[in-house]
Regions:
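Transmembrane and membrane-interface helices of multi-pass
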Residues: 2-194
């Protein structure tokens, strides 16, 4: 398997890009949770929450990834074929995988500064404060300049890395037979949205 990992010619399953990026993002979520929990270990230990933290965290990560990648998985099953529509969808899928993964990295990078300021993980306040960009920007520049610079640089690196990985992941995916598409589409719907 390893000799085929970054080669161009090996055909891949239709949903390989979705599974591959889901695995990558599960690793990102887990490493972030590990880092945050070690940083806040007194709080976690005070409630004997280590097992619960990682089990419930994994559950929420899977749910989040199903919502993020469920629609592209369904559309890949329904739209991808080796024709013009398939090539267009391949480009859209590459963008979706990259943008979704970069969003996850950005949110995980923003979490420590948000916790320091508001004592919570990013939530609806994170979005609500974005309607006041001048105030948010001045607060970030005054109190979290190093975090902003680090997050910006790391997010830009993530864009490049994820774009290349997504290009590799969507290359050589093989279309599914039309007779199997409705069955797999129903499975994707059941696993992603129910």
């Amino acid at each position: 398997m390893s000799r085929y990992l970054f080669t161009k010619g090996r055909p891949r399953s239709l949903l390989f890009p979705i599974f591959f990026f889901s695995l990558i993002n599960l690793i990102v979520f887990t490493l972030s949770r590990l880092g945050l929990s070690l940083w806040q270990q007194e709080r976690v230990s005070a409630v004997n929450g280590w097992g619960e933290l990682f089990l419930q965290g994994l559950r929420m990560d899977v749910v989040s990834l199903c919502y993020l990648f469920g629609v592209p998985a369904l559309l890949t099953v329904l739209l991808y074929h080796q024709n013009a529509l398939g090539r267009i969808w391949q480009r859209i899928l590459r963008f979706w995988l990259t943008a979704g993964s970069v969003f996850i990295v950005f949110m995980e990078l923003a979490t420590p500064a948000f916790i320091e300021t508001y004592d919570y993980r990013p939530n609806r306040l994170f979005i609500e404060y974005l309607i006041y960009p001048k105030e948010v920007f001045s607060m970030l520049m005054e109190g979290h300049l190093s975090a902003v610079i680090f997050s910006l640089v790391f997010t830009l690196i993530a864009v490049v890395v994820y774009w290349k990985l997504a290009g590799w992941a969507v290359r050589n995916i093989t279309p599914m037979r039309w007779t199997w598409r409705p069955v797999v589409a129903l499975l994707v719907i059941a696993l992603s949205f129910l």
